[in-house]
Amino acid sequence: MEKVKFIVPGEPYGKGRPRFRIVGQFQQPYTPEKTATYENLIKLEYERQCHGKRYGKEDALGMFITAYKPIPSSTSKKKSRLMLDRLIFPGKKPDWDNIGKIYCDALNGIAFQDDTQIVDGRVVKLYAELPRVEVEIWRVGQNG
């Protein structure tokens, strides 16, 4: 399968830390609702745009994620231009690694069998007038 590309509209969101609840004498971990909702959005957009394409379990994969954050409304026109020209980068949350993690986890069993297949990955955070996340996945070699 060739490279696949898809876009998730809206502001980028990073993987939230698991929460714990007490059930009897035990602590039970659970995924925060906002994280679960965003993972479902990723899955839906992948299925809709990539038509259920799935890489084989032996494929070594690369993933490139570009997260476009909105320019804050209080930003001057001069500073906005610098942000759009990629001279100022988003230094705020979500962290780049949490963005990558939520996409890898959401696409487990959807685009690929397991996120351990990702051997080459990169996340870039930029500013844009239209917030979104663009994702590319490709085969980088054959295992076995």
Question: Can you say where each PLM-predicted feature lies in the sequence?
Answer:
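Acidic, proline/glycine-enriched N-terminal capping motif
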Residues: 1-144
